[in-house]
Amino acid sequence: MNKFITVKEAANKWNVSERSVRNYCVLGRVPDAVFENGCWLIPETAKKPTRLNEKENKNHLLERLREEKKHQISGGIYHKLQIDLTYNSNHIEGSELTHDQTRYIFETRTIGLESTNTSVKVDDVIETINHFSAIDRVIDFANYELSESFIKELHKILKTGTSDSRLSWFAVGEYKKRSNEVGGLATTSPQQVNDEMKKLISDYNQKDKHSFEEIVEFHVKFERIHPFQDGNGRVGRLIILKECLKNNIVPFVILDNKKMFYYRGLKNWNQERGWLLDTCLDGQDTVKAYLDYFGIVYHS
């Protein structure tokens, strides 16, 4: 019968941090390690995992995004993801800007109108520019542990300067003051949002590394809480981007023409996880095609 030691005991034995020990366990690098009552138990005879080859552990996408962002390189993956993620995420929420208009705003910081009779909503333009800034923030802080303050910061970036921000009861960068619904379903009440969000983040951060399915599951729980008055979908998808980059997982884009499958998956997660996971995996295939085109190595 196996004898087990605690994470702390393994950390002392291997001369590494407790976080590193938990990370080894999460990644399956400690054979026969057991997760019980929120804690990892390590076989007493387990040996310290060897260090991964730097090439295997390298986050090529995040590295490229940061390089292209820093030097404002156009026509690369940073350029591509900024436009496609922003266009599709905003369009899901009702933005009327076209893909070309979104691209034009990103490239020139001006709005191109196809004719003198064309009009656009000011909020659509502001939220598009703000979404570009929010993606930049995600890239900069991708490796940080997810926190309430960061989530609130994303909301503040997204909604600053919009007509919503001028409403006395609309809390930009803070949790909602009025009850709301999503898809006709009730969400967490304003009085309970603080506690629910703290629990959601605390539970999620029990692990250092997360799988694709765990990131999607977090998204479902976040959207059901619906912590902000508006902008929850976009903030939620920005969190997905951050966590995929942090965990060296190819991110995904929910295309506007797949939004009904996306909504169906969110609504029916408890009954059938496969619907949402398949939609997200389809969106991941879209991004993988981008990475193949730009010659960026990723873990399949």
Where are the predicted features?
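FIC/Doc superfamily catalytic core
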Residues: 1-14, 18-30, 35-38, 44-300
